[in-house]
C-alpha cells in the first residue's frame, strides 16, 4: 500500500510504524493492486488510504472494524467517510481534531543549564537496565512498540529521575523514514516544574545528532503541549480531523 501514501496522510501518528512492522496491526485492501486500504493497529488506531468513492469497500471496511468491541481512533477521517459509515451502520463519532507541527531547526536553541533549578532531578537514557520501569511508567508505551526489544533496537528515549522515581519520560513513539514522533508524559503532581521541557530539549537535540527530524502532533485543546512545542521550535502547520468511532 506504499503507493497510497501521500503528503495528506503520511504524517498520521504511527501509520508508518504499522506498515514497517514496529507496531502490530492489520491491513485490508480493496483489490490485488489496491486503490484503497484500511490500516488498523492492534490498539485500534485506524487509517483509511486512497479511494473513498468505492462504497462497497468502505462497507467492507466498516464491517471489518465492527468485528472488534470498543471505540476506535480514526486519524484523518473525512466527512465523506463519516457519511458513508452513518449510511451503513449505527455509529457515533466524537471529534478530537489535532494539530500537526513542522520543526524549525533555526528556532531551536538549548537553554542554559541554570534555567532548570531542580538539582535532584537527573536525566537518564532508556536502556536495558530501566526499560521495564519506563514501560510501567507509561501504559501507552505498548501502543507504540512491539515489545521492549523492538524499542531498544529501533527507538530511544529518556527518563527524568527524582528520588529514584521516574517523574517524567520522553520516548520516540516511532522512528520511520528519518522522522521521530515525540511522546512526552509527566506525572500530574510534578507538572509545571520544567521536567518535560528539559527532557524534550535533550530528546530533540538527540534527534538532530542522529540526523533525524522530530515530529510533534497534539490535540487542539492541549495548551501545555502547544506551548512546549513552540518553545522547542515547532511551528503549527495544519489542523486535521481525528474522531473516536463507537458502534
Give each language-model segment a name.
Residues 55-62, 192-206, 227, 231:
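Conserved acetyl-CoA-binding loop-helix of GNAT-fold acetyltransferases
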Residues 24-129, 243:
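Acyl-donor-binding surface of acyltransferase catalytic domains
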Residues 179, 184-198:
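Conserved glycine-rich acetyl-CoA-binding loop
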Residues 81-92, 197, 220-238:
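Conserved active-site alpha-helix within GNAT-family acetyltransferase domains
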Residues 106-179:
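Flexible, substrate/cofactor-facing loop regions flanked by secondary structure
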Residues 34-35, 165-168, 224:
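Glycine-rich acetyl-CoA-binding "A-motif" of GNAT/NAT acetyltransferases
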Residues 1-30:
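Amide-forming acyltransferase catalytic core, primarily the GNAT-like/NAT-type
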Residues 184, 214-218:
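Conserved hydrophobic beta-strand within the GNAT/NAT acetyltransferase core sheet
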Amino acid at each position: 500500500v506504499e503507493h497510497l501514501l501521500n503528503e495528506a496522510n503520511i504524517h498520521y501518528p504511527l501509520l508508518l510504524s504499522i506498515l514497517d512492522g514496529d507496531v502490530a496491526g492489520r491491513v485490508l485492501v480493496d483489490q490485488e493492486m489496491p486503490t484503497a486500504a484500511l490500516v488498523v493497529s492492534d490498539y485500534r488506531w485506524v487509517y483509511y488510504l486512497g479511494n473513498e468513492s468505492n462504497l462497497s469497500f468502505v462497507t467492507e471496511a466498516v464491517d471489518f472494524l465492527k468485528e472488534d468491541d470498543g471505540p476506535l481512533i480514526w486519524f484523518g477521517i473525512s466527512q465523506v467517510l463519516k457519511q458513508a459509515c452513518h449510511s451503513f451502520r449505527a455509529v457515533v463519532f466524537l471529534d478530537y481534531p489535532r494539530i500537526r507541527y513542522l520543526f524549525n531547526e533555526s528556532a531551536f536553541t538549548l537553554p542554559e543549564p541554570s534555567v532548570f533549578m531542580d538539582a535532584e532531578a537527573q536525566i537518564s537514557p532508556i536502556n536495558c537496565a530501566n526499560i521495564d520501569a519506563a514501560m510501567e511508567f507509561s501504559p501507552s508505551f505498548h501502543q507504540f512498540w512491539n515489545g521492549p526489544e523492538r524499542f531498544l533496537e529501533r527507538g530511544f528515549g529518556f527518563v527524568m529521575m527524582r528520588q529514584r522515581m521516574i517523574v517524567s519520560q520522553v520516548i520516540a513513539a516511532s522512528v520511520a523514514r528519518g522522522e521521530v514522533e515525540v511522546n512526552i508524559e509527566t506525572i500530574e503532581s510534578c507538572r509545571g516544574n520544567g521536567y518535560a521541557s528539559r527532557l524534550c530539549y535533550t530528546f530533540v537535540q538527540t534527534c538532530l545528532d542522529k540526523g533525524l527530524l522530530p515530529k510533534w502532533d497534539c490535540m487542539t485543546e492541549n495548551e501545555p503541549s502547544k506551548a512546549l512545542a513552540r518553545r522547542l521550535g515547532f511551528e503549527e502547520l495544519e489542523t486535521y480531523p481525528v474522531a473516536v468511532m463507537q458502534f
